């Protein structure tokens, strides 16, 4: 009855991909003064948008899965040393992106 409600396999894979993508593009402690930061952020934003769109085509998240997504991203980024205010804001932004993309599919 609740089998799919608590199934977070796809959510965990997506969250892990997001954390790895951010870590690869903008390592913790990056210098915002670098000349390529804006280009890297633009490419990261584009990749996140594309992956989020494809993720929401195959997954409709319930409240538990949305919370799991935010928590998994938050835990992963904090483990890599990103500042807590950035992590909180970023994880909520990803959940908002997923919610918006889910509505437009």
List the predicted regions and their residue ranges.
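Short cationic/low-complexity microdomains
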Residues: 2-9, 59-80
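Amphipathic alpha-helical binding modules
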Residues: 73-105
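Short amphipathic alpha-helical segments
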Residues: 14, 65-69, 86, 90
